[in-house]
UniProtKB/Swiss-Prot annotation:
Subunit relationships: Interacts with NELL2; triggers epididymal differentiation. Interacts with cell surface receptor TFRC; the interaction mediates uptake of NICOL1 into fibroblasts.
Location(s), subcellular: Secreted; Cytoplasm, Perinuclear region
Lineage: Eukaryota, Metazoa, Chordata, Craniata, Vertebrata
Designated name of the protein: NELL2-interacting cell ontogeny regulator 1
Listed GO CC annotations: extracellular space; perinuclear region of cytoplasm
Top-level division of the source organism's lineage: Eukaryota
Source organism of the structure: Bos taurus (Bovine)
Family: Belongs to the NICOL family.
Primary location recorded for the protein, binned into one broad class: secreted
Signal sequence segment: 1-35
Gene: NICOL1
Main function: mRNA-binding protein which interacts with a range of target mRNAs including SERPINE1, ACTA2, CCN2 and COL4A1 and may promote extracellular matrix production. Binds to the 3'-UTR of SERPINE1 mRNA and stabilizes the mRNA, possibly by competing for binding with SERBP1 and preventing SERBP1-mediated mRNA degradation. Also binds to the 3'-UTR of ACTA2. Testis-derived lumicrine factor that triggers epididymal differentiation and sperm maturation.
Length: 97
């Protein structure tokens, strides 16, 4: 196997290549900003649901869930209080009367 030639200092790319890469990158980066939507593919603003509407609907459902949970906890608490009162009342009455 033949020995590899010694490496020299790295060569800089030719100026034309740098200019071409610069123009290509500027074109690619600027393309999305200037791109026009294809005809017929744009959704009119009136038919697009907004983010605020989705957030409002989510908060409405969360509030309904919280109300149901609060009602359930309230009913359970009332049931437990009635049981405790009944036990306390029954403990006061003599067994023979």
């Amino acid at each position: 196997m033949a020995p590899l030639p010694p490496c020299g200092p790295p060569r800089s790319p030719p100026p034309r290549l740098l200019l071409l890469l610069l123009l290509l990158s500027a074109t690619l980066l600027g393309a999305p900003a200037r791109a026009e939507p294809a005809a017929g593919s744009a959704v009119p603003a009136q038919s697009r649901p907004c983010v605020d509407c989705h957030a409002f609907e989510f908060m409405q459902r969360a509030l309904q869930d919280l109300r149901k949970t609060a009602y359930s906890l309230d009913a359970r608490t009332e049931s437990l209080l009635l049981q405790a009162e009944r036990r306390a009342l029954c403990a006061c009455w003599p067994a023979g009367h």
